[in-house]
Amino acid sequence: VRDGYIAQPENCVYHCFPGSSGCDTLCKEKGGTSGHCGFKVGHGLACWCNALPDNVGIIVEGEKCHS
């Protein structure tokens, strides 16, 4: 397990609103313990997850979003 900004298949972040429960819900659905809306340089507001399973993608540094 690991912590990180949860990624969509194209190495794109899940955008969010500070203070909303959306990231916590998303992270728990994906097997993490919790989540919150954070700020990722180069991506903007993005969901951060705690204790995600290894089979759930997180943002790869240096890779662009390929949407």
UniProtKB/Swiss-Prot annotation:
Sites of Serine amide modification: 67
Locations listed in the record: Secreted
GO BP, one annotated term: defense response
Keyword check for Disulfide bond: yes
GO cellular component, one term: extracellular region
Any single Pfam family the record assigns to this protein: Toxin_3
Job description of the protein: Alpha toxins bind voltage-independently at site-3 of sodium channels (Nav) and inhibit the inactivation of the activated channels, thereby blocking neuronal transmission. The dissociation is voltage-dependent. This alpha-like toxin is highly toxic to insects and competes with LqhaIT on binding to insect sodium channels. Differs from classical anti-mammalian alpha-toxins as it inhibits sodium channel inactivation in cell bodies of hippocampus brain neurons, on which the anti-mammalian Lqh2 is inactive, and is unable to affect Nav1.2 in the rat brain, on which Lqh2 is highly active.
Protein name: Alpha-like toxin Lqh3
Biological source species: Leiurus hebraeus
Highest classification ranks of the organism: Eukaryota, Metazoa, Ecdysozoa, Arthropoda, Chelicerata
